[in-house]
Amino acid sequence: MKRFCVILLLALSSLTTSYAQSVIIGEKLPDMNLRKYLMDFQPEQTPYTCYLFYHSKSELCKRSLTAIKPLIKDANAQLGLVIITKEEYEDAGVTLTEHLDDYISVAFDLQGRAFRSVNVNFIPFCIICDHKRRVLWCGNAATLTQNVLDKILTTK
């Protein structure tokens, strides 16, 4: 009876599997239609771009941003960061203004198109892609290390 219950539980859990993001390493990132940037400050063109899906009230998002900022600065203009939020300027703009620089920008996704285009179901979520928009890495930016980033930036 116990074996039957375990098999039944496994079968039911496989039917209700929740899907995370639909981003696949090596495939092209869908167009996210980012149009509205904080202070109209669009990111500099860089060989690699990191997209960080963000919410200003989330402590995990704040930690993720804090962890990735030094990596962006150490990338020597090879990697730009676009912070994407579904929040209004009044909610997120003020707190995110301090993070703006030549290689860090904030995009407002008020209708959630960017979140939907890559099926973001949890935040913080981060995607690194090359200039052809080919996905090279995805996950929580807080787990990205300098060694992993170096491999991403040096692999052709």
Task: Map each language-model feature to its residues.
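Bacterial N-terminal signal peptides
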Residues: C5-S14
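Short active-site neighborhood of thiol/selenol oxidoreductases, capturing the structured segment around
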Residues: F41-S64
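Structural microenvironment flanking redox-active thiols in thiol-disulfide oxidoreductases
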Residues: K62-H99
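Thiol-/selenol-based redox modules, centered on thioredoxin-like
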Residues: C129-K156
